Amino acid sequence: MNRDGAGEGDSVSHEHSTSKTDEKAKTVPLYKLFAFADSFDVFLMICGSLGAIGNGVCLPLMTLLFGDLIDSFGKNQNNKDIVDVVSKVCLKFVYLGLGRLGAAFLQVACWMITGERQAAKIRSNYLKTILRQDIGFFDVETNTGEVVGRMSGDTVHIQDAMGEKVGKFIQLVSTFVGGFALAFAKGWLLTLVMLTSIPFLAMAGAAMALLVTRASSRGQAAYAKAATVVEQTIGSIRTVASFTGEKQAINSYKKYITSAYKSSIQQGFSTGLGLGVMIYVFFSSYALAIWFGGKMILEKGYTGGSVINVIIIVVAGSMSLGQTSPCVTAFAAGQAAAYKMFETIKRKPLIDAYDVNGKVLGDIRGDIELKDVHFSYPARPDEEIFDGFSLFIPSGATAALVGESGSGKSTVINLIERFYDPKAGEVLIDGINLKEFQLKWIRSKIGLVCQEPVLFSSSIMENIAYGKENATLQEIKVATELANAAKFINNLPQGLDTKVGEHGTQLSGGQKQRIAIARAILKDPRVLLLDEATSALDTESERVVQEALDRVMVNRTTVVVAHRLSTVRNADMIAVIHSGKMVEKGSHSELLKDSVGAYSQLIRCQEINKGHDAKPSDMASGSSFRNSNLNISREGSVISGGTSSFGNSSRHHSLNVLGLFAGLDLGSGSQRVGQEETGTTSQEPLRKVSLTRIAALNKPEIPVLLLGTVVAAINGAIFPLFGILISRVIEAFFKPADQLKKDSRFWAIIFVALGVTSLIVSPSQMYLFAVAGGKLIRRIQSMCFEKAVHMEVSWFDEPENSSGTMGARLSTDAALIRALVGDALSLAVQNAASAASGLIIAFTASWELALIILVMLPLIGINGFLQVKFMKGFSADAKSKYEEASQVANDAVGSIRTVASFCAEEKVMQMYNKQCEGPIKDGVKQGFISGLGFGFSFFILFCVYATSFYAAARLVEDGKTTFIDVFQVFFALTMAAIGISQSSTFAPDSSKAKVAAASIFAIIDRKSKIDSSDETGTVLENVKGDIELRHLSFTYPARPGIQIFRDLCLTIRAGKTVALVGESGSGKSTVISLLQRFYDPDSGQITLDGVELKKLQLKWLRQQMGLVGQEPVLFNDTIRANIAYGKGSEEAATESEIIAAAELANAHKFISSIQQGYDTVVGEKGIQLSGGQKQRVAIARAIVKEPKILLLDEATSALDAESERLVQDALDRVIVNRTTVVVAHRLSTIKNADVIAIVKNGVIAENGTHETLIKIDGGVYASLVQLHMTASN
């Protein structure tokens, strides 16, 4: 909707505010993450927690059994009972394994399922809250890219923090608590001494969590900015391509991902440092325990067995505490990610769409009154739009608001819809303040048709059904008939089920508009608000739609913002608004009586523009200003056929200016229809990506990785070495007193040394792998983005390459790939080193026993493999389903005004929840299977222990090994097993990462059919600007069944102006798309100065052309940067060039009058400027480029008479000596063209000057002009 100059500068303040809060890294208390749990979730969490406690206590219980074993072996090593005694203990191991299977299953399954369910609730609550916010919130605090980023990226962190990681955390803590309880029972004094290390551990852990949270918040903030760059670039790809802005987009994207990379390194280093300190503290405390334990044996009569039991239990308990660090990291990341989402969820909107309080009457009459209204847009509170504005519209009357662009006309509509509340004064309906009504009810009585209708990426039928809950097919059909849309819909292959594409790009402008009107008609409103509702239609459609509107307007209060003569002239009341004041009001004939009044001046303005070809009478009649339109086909200007238009991608509020153009003719079938049916066959299934391929991308970091590998290997060997030390200590404890004293001191020192090693090794390992992983992600993201930006335009017509989906791919997928390289490699090396050193130590101690255990290793291997298999989580299918769900969110947030005005919030939520059902079911299934795999793996492990000790007893019985060697083998292998089991915790990540890698490499490997990064091709020294289209035939790749051009020939001489005229959908804008090589013709050729376009360097070719579309796409940056974009970057254009271009485009004056001038930020999609203002900025952007060829696609259609005159003057100055191709409906523009070409049925039906064509009796042009004349009378 045209915001009438509202709100520049908003995003400026927003940028500052977010960056400040991010610095402080705010988080949510952990328990608050579970705020959305229902009773079933609570049940699951209780079961899961009980399972986790059971699972955790198994380890200390196992150490008790282990104490029994030491006793059994120690006391019976020389007698025949050893096998009997030991086998009894072994049986207990098997029972414990069974118990652990059940507990582990409950732990994993319950927590994974509840995590999936609650994350889904948070996502859906977040979207629900976003939809209920007042429109001002979207102007100031958020944008589509951020919402989609939070829903796809941040919820992954939140789910991570509330799913199986919680179970794991409870398990580890209960191991710790259970262990210490048993240790106190066995030997309290020694346990107390060992406990002294706990405060140090806690401090290290807390410091680490703090640092990690800080870094991760900073990283998320940088990624959110990068996501916005992706959203803006992909969403406006035609503009980016036309202005060769790819490089600029890539650079700003790289800037943000580099700052995210820096945060990730800090995060890695902090984690490593924390771990290193923890392990150092552990080892020092063991040193203390060994020295002190020796003392206890000598002085307090402890036995060696009990000392070892206490040490082992405390080791096991404390180690489990150390393993909580990934959980703590995940909690910290989840808490940081949840902060922004929960803040939003808690936010109470100023105008609440879900508020059920307020009056609900039987019906309303429809008297509308604005009483002494003071208003400024929230994004620019200092700039008053209205300062005491009043207006009364009696029920059933039609009131027309006219005035220049930016005067506040659309603001009236915004206030009546209650998108905003006035600062002072009131807006009344039937004498009751709007604030007193129930918002949903009063909005249901108001129908809105904007100048730039917003459609959702679903079918035509679903789009119309937004107008009314539970509408029947019959009602929908009647509404399409009334809106004159039934005919073109029936011509589409899928009829009402045709998909309209992202933002309706599959339809031409007029088609979109008629669907929007049908949607409003279905609502059967008492008050109808038409914001330029017919401006986008060609004469023929306009006549029929206007008749439809006339039928619909009967007995309804109607407020029209328009420039069209016919609409305004018959209005009961016309109000002329200037700079937020009503300067005149009355009927058409009353206002004309004052020959120096504002209205008469507007009309005169129009006459000059119009040329003098129309009869003065109609001129006068002229309402506001569109009468001059030869509106020949505005309807679609669009591009006829594909998604064309440049703007289209702009999407939402762009004012489109006239809305429309974006679409294409749908002459038949939505562009993507063919594919939808077949299930988008166009996309081949993703090829698997080999790990070597990803590793190759990490090549530059080989030195870092090698060093990291060495460090990780040292780190991995630490625990098995620890095993030798413990078995040596056991031995020492059974030695004579003086030897015991000496040995205990010696081994204590060795332990401290081991701790110091860990202190150096751990942070180095984390840091080195963070550098390698971070650089890899950054490289993959920039390669992928760079590749995507250079794809041919038709690639973006595919739904799977929409801006929302691409944003999710770049943020989520790239981060997952890192798990394959950095973290996973680091862990794999560490675990391999643990395993290898464990085996070596075991074999040296007792090769027979080690061999027996080794034979059983495959069992452990199989169980590890099963775990990996079971954890194949979040399969590709679920991933793309969530992508589809985020597209629903993307659409709704981008079109929040439409959603609000149709009270469609619940409908959007239903669509969103429907898209999420599948992935949630998959998550539940996956949780169930993972739980089984996880439990089973523990059972196998315990069976292996039981078998090993039984075999050991046999060997001891036969005298083949000694009791100390048995334990050395056991400790070395246990420690190795702990290493191996840790690596399986990375299983879920690697499978997700492979799917992610495939989706990213699918983009990197694709060859662009029209590659703007390709530097080859001819560059002409001197461009004259002769263009020739020879025998073109063309269909849009996404709709191969619809022929746009059959055999089109057209010659455009250098320096001349050619106007293309024709009905909506005839292919006029397609000519412009082909000239810029957004698409290539199927046959025939286009030449520039005799050279075929395909032979010219693409980037150079696009630099020779300046495009001004009817729906200009501006970026969320300053006005200066938007104009300089024409040169390719802000640095390339000097201040004087920018100002000169703005003056030429008649934009300098309005820019200078805004507080921040050229530094004003235009807002997402330029929403802070009115239509006419945006258009002038776009013209300045094209002028700065100094193009040889100018392409004007309805460039002035969105302007009021005054701006149009000025812009038209500017364009007249600019087109001198330039080859110009104009798609237009204004008689004046077309009439003065050197050649007018009529496009019809895929060929040029007539061409010549206005004078020659008008004389052809029964000619297409002559009849169009005739139709126009009668329409204006």
From Swiss-Prot:
Domain (ABC transporter) ranges: 368-604, 1027-1266
GO cellular component, one term: membrane
Keyword flag tRNA processing: no
Binding-site list for ATP 2: G1062, E1063, S1064, G1065, S1066, G1067, K1068, S1069
Binding site for ATP 1: G403, E404, S405, G406, S407, G408, K409, S410
UniProt xrefs under SUPFAM superfamilies: ABC transporter transmembrane region, P-loop containing nucleoside triphosphate hydrolases
GO molecular function terms noted in the UniProt entry: ABC-type transporter activity; ATP binding; ATP hydrolysis activity
Subcellular location: Membrane
PROSITE patterns: ABC_TM1F, ABC_TRANSPORTER_1, ABC_TRANSPORTER_2
CDD domains cross-referenced by the UniProt entry: ABC_6TM_Pgp_ABCB1_D1_like, ABC_6TM_Pgp_ABCB1_D2_like, ABC_MTABC3_MDL1_MDL2
Transmembrane portions of the chain: 42-62, 93-113, 169-189, 192-212, 272-292, 301-321, 706-726, 746-766, 840-860, 927-947, 961-981
Coiled coil: none
Short name of any one Pfam family annotated for the protein: ABC_membrane
Membrane topology annotation: Multi-pass membrane protein
UniProt family annotation: Belongs to the ABC transporter superfamily. ABCB family. Multidrug resistance exporter (TC 3.A.1.201) subfamily.
InterPro entries tied to this protein: AAA+_ATPase, ABC1_TM_dom, ABC1_TM_sf, ABC_transporter-like_ATP-bd, ABC_transporter-like_CS, P-loop_NTPase, Type_1_exporter
Keywords tagged on the record: ATP-binding, Glycoprotein, Membrane, Nucleotide-binding, Repeat, Transmembrane, Transmembrane helix, Transport
Domain ABC transmembrane type-1 positions: 45-333, 705-992
Region Disordered: start-end pairs: 1-20
Residues the record marks as carrying a glycan: N470, N555, N631, N648, N801, N1116, N1217, N1247
Name of the molecule in the record: ABC transporter B family member 12
